[in-house]
Curated annotation (Swiss-Prot):
<dbReference type="GO" id="GO:0004640">
    <property type="term" value="F:phosphoribosylanthranilate isomerase activity"/>
</dbReference>
<comment type="pathway">
    <text>Amino-acid biosynthesis; L-tryptophan biosynthesis; L-tryptophan from chorismate: step 3/5.</text>
</comment>
<feature type="active site" description="Proton acceptor">
    <location>
        <position position="14"/>
    </location>
</feature>
<dbReference type="GO" id="GO:0000105">
    <property type="term" value="P:L-histidine biosynthetic process"/>
</dbReference>
<dbReference type="GO" id="GO:0005737">
    <property type="term" value="C:cytoplasm"/>
</dbReference>
<comment type="similarity">
    <text>Belongs to the HisA/HisF family.</text>
</comment>
<keyword id="KW-0368">Histidine biosynthesis</keyword>
<keyword id="KW-0057">Aromatic amino acid biosynthesis</keyword>
<dbReference type="InterPro" id="IPR011060">
    <property type="entry name" value="RibuloseP-bd_barrel"/>
</dbReference>
<feature type="active site" description="Proton donor">
    <location>
        <position position="133"/>
    </location>
</feature>
<dbReference type="InterPro" id="IPR044524">
    <property type="entry name" value="Isoase_HisA-like"/>
</dbReference>
<comment type="function">
    <text>Involved in both the histidine and tryptophan biosynthetic pathways.</text>
</comment>
<keyword id="KW-0822">Tryptophan biosynthesis</keyword>
<comment type="pathway">
    <text>Amino-acid biosynthesis; L-histidine biosynthesis; L-histidine from 5-phospho-alpha-D-ribose 1-diphosphate: step 4/9.</text>
</comment>
<dbReference type="InterPro" id="IPR023016">
    <property type="entry name" value="Isoase_HisA-like_bact"/>
</dbReference>
<protein>
    <recommendedName>
        <fullName>Phosphoribosyl isomerase A</fullName>
        <ecNumber>5.3.1.16</ecNumber>
        <ecNumber>5.3.1.24</ecNumber>
    </recommendedName>
</protein>
<keyword id="KW-0963">Cytoplasm</keyword>
């Protein structure tokens, strides 16, 4: 990539029973609640977001769904939405795409149902991103599925497989960092970006504007955007401050 592009910021709205929440390390039961999901999403739009990362955590954990609410949220927004959580088969994928979201993020299904994932990547192209939720154990990069409860194999093997199938984009999370405000795993992001030609979106750990500036140094290696959640909700910085820091 020759042209230096500003890092795209995607404020996260994680939804449990219709409310915006943040988890610590993706663990069910660690929620901090931040009010209505719709109000949160509209607030980020008002603050200048061009993208919203909208997650149905109930669907991701297999304990229900906020499908109708999320469709309403997408319909009320004028900005692009990346929709994630529990998209594991044709029916849930079609329902997600029918909301009018810009793209969907597939996680567990890419690990548990690789043939289906290959089919939808081929069929829907840029409308499908794959979430790579990584847990580093004894220097092994392992993928996690089912709301990070199950082992999904070796990161590098799965990444090479998805690349060969033409996956258009990856959302990369270090699950030990997510919701902790401990800073992103820049080494992991850089290594994934170097291994694939597809753009990478960073997720997890952002705690400060300096963290965003650090991720932005990886744009020429293929890191396209960063999902920001807890730091915004906890008031570490505002979205306008973050956009200004990214030159937007």
């Amino acid at each position: 990539m020759s042209e230096k592009r500003p890092l795209i910021l995607l404020p996260a709205v994680d939804v449990v029973e219709g409310r915006a929440v943040r988890l610590v390390q993706g663990k069910a039961g660690s929620e901090t609640e931040y009010g209505s999901a719709l109000d949160a999403a509209l607030g980020w739009q008002r603050d200048g977001a061009e993208w919203i990362h909208l997650v149905d955590l109930d669907a991701a954990f297999g304990r229900g769904s906020n499908r109708e609410l999320l469709a309403d949220v997408v319909g009320r927004l004028d900005v692009a939405v990346e929709l994630s959580g529990g998209i594991r088969d044709d029916e849930s994928l079609e329902a997600a795409l029918a909301t009018g979201c810009a793209r969907v993020n597939i996680g567990t299904a890419a690990l548990e149902n690789p043939q289906w994932c290959a089919k939808v990547v081929a069929e829907f192209g840029d409308k499908v991103a794959v979430g790579l939720d990584v847990k580093i154990v004894d220097d092994q990069h392992r993928l996690r599925g089912r709301g990070w409860e199950t082992d999904g194999g070796d990161l590098w093997e799965v990444l090479d497989r998805l690349d060969s199938e033409g996956c258009s984009r990856y959302v990369v999370t270090d699950v030990t960092k997510d919701g902790t405000l401990q800073g992103p795993n820049l080494d992991l992001l850089g290594r994934v970006a170097d291994r694939t030609d597809a753009p990478v979106i960073a997720s997890g750990g952002v705690s400060s504007l300096d963290d965003l500036r650090a991720i932005a140094t990886l744009t020429d290696r293929g890191v396209e955007g960063a999902i920001v959640g807890k730091a915004l909700y906890a008031g570490r910085f505002t979205l306008p401050e973050a956009l200004a820091a990214m030159g937007q």
